[in-house]
């Protein structure tokens, strides 16, 4: 009777296409590296740098009350349908500070002259002054802008502030709102790369064996991020897409390259030639890389079933990142392996010393936010490398670590343990998975706000000052659109705002003019007005979500007035409800597509 074919034999079956591709990459390694990948990197980097990104975070549901509010405000006054921002002032009896009134008037006049901006001064609205009188805020309503336009606007407003407000002594000025958030390179990704470098060097005992996966992933990441930046002009992508690409791309890029490098080193240790070892690595581990990559891409594209435009853009960007990493792993990496040949296991004293200097300087640069420290480390690493050409001792190879026989390794013995006691392994692992899944049943979905920013940033300080003076809810106002006779009557509108102010968890509510001529405007033949409601709880608290539902389901219907609750905070509540309802469809789509892929492969 013939022996059955195992899954390993199917997965690692020799594939003529992969074999031919690997052989081409080894034999034409200079063309692959210097004629394809590196030029591609510079081309997309230059193009993306010239075009800039056109990322737009369009948090609009297909059908929701917050969407209806958004559409009404866009018709009435597009500035009210975009970003809400604040300029916060703190000082003793701040509005009585000599010179502040004139300086603030000059500031708001110049900011209000910018296209698509409405301003409201605390001198015109007492509710924008804290009870202590020490904190006040000016409100800015800004029309929707792309990420690049938002950065330009933020810089322009703060430049106006420097010119008009800094001469007023005794007053602290901070700028709050998402539009003033400055993009910084996430420290987590940089720390992750440093951790990967240290772990891989310890695991492989070789700088080159570590450097190839890291280098391949970084080059692929640069191409992926630049490509996504270019594509943001063709399809809607949120402004955090590049962070998602970096997070997913680095993870899979290093992982996929590790598969192939490990198999290549095993081939060399088995006595294969360089070309044969590369071909064998791509034939086996490369096939696993393609299978794993396609599975991840399918899972990401499963996000399309959510039916949200910004989620589709996010999924597309992350899928592009994974695709680039897959291609780099089976083309660029084999070419690099063909270049280093047997030197992949050779590490000199100079290489280790240069790596230590570089890692420590990079860590210090991240901790102290100092680019000169990183540059100093780079200079030190280059100097050590240069000195190795003068001092022979620096070129001395570090003894190669003795590799244990396969049967003596921990993972070999672990696999045998699992095979001998399958039920023990199954029950134990299933129990751990169940325990880890318990928090899922109490998860609350939503969006972060500027309260999550670092404490030293102006947006976080503005957030904290507003929370100190008015309560945390002032950082997440609710926009209530009012239609009908109430909108046309200032007295009735004030009475309605007063009724909303009496609701539990409402700090205060105030009408907000929709036009320069008065508090209301006419849309489709019907008066429309806006009331801004400030909760007592912060935007991310459960009580704020409950307030949105209470206003919609109980308080507003009881008044008999036609009004709808929207704004960013209400939209985040709608998103949480919508996404929670769509999660089963997402999970089902991913499982079905993955099952079909497994059926096709096996």
Residue ranges and their predicted role:
Residues 1-53, 117, 143-445, 559-563, ...:
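Membrane-embedded transmembrane helical bundles of large multi-pass transporters/channels
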Residues 63-84, 91-175, 447-602:
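Structured non-transmembrane domains adjacent to transmembrane bundles in polytopic membrane proteins
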């Amino acid at each position: 009777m013939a022996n059955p074919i195992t899954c390993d034999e199917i997965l690692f079956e020799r594939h003529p296409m992969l074999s031919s591709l690997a052989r081409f990459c080894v034999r034409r390694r200079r063309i692959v590296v210097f004629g394809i990948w590196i030029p591609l990197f510079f081309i997309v980097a230059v193009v993306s740098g010239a075009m800039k990104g056109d990322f737009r975070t369009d948090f609009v549901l297909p059908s929701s009350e917050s969407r209806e509010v958004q559409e009404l405000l866009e018709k009435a006054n597009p500035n009210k349908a975009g970003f809400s921002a604040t300029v916060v002032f703190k000082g003793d009896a701040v509005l009585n500070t000599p010179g502040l009134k004139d300086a603030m008037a000059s500031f708001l006049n110049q900011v209000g002259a910018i296209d698509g901006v409405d301003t409201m001064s605390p001198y015109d609205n007492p509710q924008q002054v804290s009870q202590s009188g020490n904190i006040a805020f000016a409100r800015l309503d800004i029309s929707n802008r792309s990420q690049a336009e938002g950065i330009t606007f933020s810089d322009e407003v703060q430049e106006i502030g420097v010119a008009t407000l800094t001469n007023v002594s005794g007053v602290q000025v901070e700028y709050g709102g998402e539009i003033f958030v400055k993009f910084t390179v996430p420290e987590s990704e940089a720390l992750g790369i440093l951790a990967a470098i240290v772990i891989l060097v310890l695991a492989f005992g070789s700088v080159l064996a570590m450097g190839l996966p890291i280098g391949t992933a970084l080059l692929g990441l640069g191409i992926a991020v630049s490509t996504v930046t270019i594509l943001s002009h063709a399809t809607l992508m949120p402004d955090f897409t590049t962070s998602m690409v970096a997070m997913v791309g680095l993870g899979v890029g290093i992982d996929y390259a590790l598969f192939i490098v490990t198999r290549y080193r095993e081939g060399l240790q088995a006595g294969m030639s360089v070309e044969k070892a590369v071909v064998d690595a791509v034939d086996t581990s490369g096939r696993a890389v393609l299978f794993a990559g396609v599975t991840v891409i399918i899972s990401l594209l499963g996000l399309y079933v959510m039916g949200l435009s910004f989620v589709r853009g996010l999924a597309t960007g992350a899928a592009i990142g994974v695709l680039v990493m897959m291609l780099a792993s089976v083309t660029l990496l084999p070419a690099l392996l063909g270049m280093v040949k047997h030197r992949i296991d050779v590490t000199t004293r100079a290489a280790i010393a240069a790596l230590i200097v570089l890692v420590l300087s990079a860590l210090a640069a991240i901790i102290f936010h100092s680019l000169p420290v990183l540059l100093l480390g780079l200079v030190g690493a280059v100097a050590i490398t240069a000195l190795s050409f003068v001092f022979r001792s620096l070129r001395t190879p570090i003894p190669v670590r003795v590799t244990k026989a396969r049967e003596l390794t921990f993972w070999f013995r672990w696999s045998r343990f699992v095979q001998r006691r399958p039920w023990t392994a199954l029950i134990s692992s299933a129990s751990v998975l169940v325990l880890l899944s318990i928090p899922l049943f109490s998860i609350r979905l939503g969006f972060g706000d500027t309260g999550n920013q670092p404490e030293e940033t102006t947006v976080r300080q503005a957030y904290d000052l507003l929370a100190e003076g008015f309560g945390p809810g002032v950082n997440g106002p609710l926009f209530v659109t009012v239609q009908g006779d109430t909108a046309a009557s200032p007295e009735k509108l004030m009475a309605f705002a007063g009724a909303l102010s009496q609701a539990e968890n409402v700090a205060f509510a105030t009408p907000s003019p929709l036009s320069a001529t008065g508090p209301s405007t006419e849309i489709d033949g019907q008066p429309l007005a806006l009331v801004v409601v400030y909760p007592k709880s912060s935007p991310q608290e459960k009580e704020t979500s409950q307030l949105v539902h209470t206003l919609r389901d109980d308080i507003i219907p009881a008044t008999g007035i036609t009004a709808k609750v929207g704004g960013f905070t209400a939209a985040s509540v709608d998103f949480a409800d919508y996404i929670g309802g769509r999660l089963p469809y997402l999970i089902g789509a991913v499982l079905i597509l993955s099952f079909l892929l497994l059926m096709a492969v096996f």
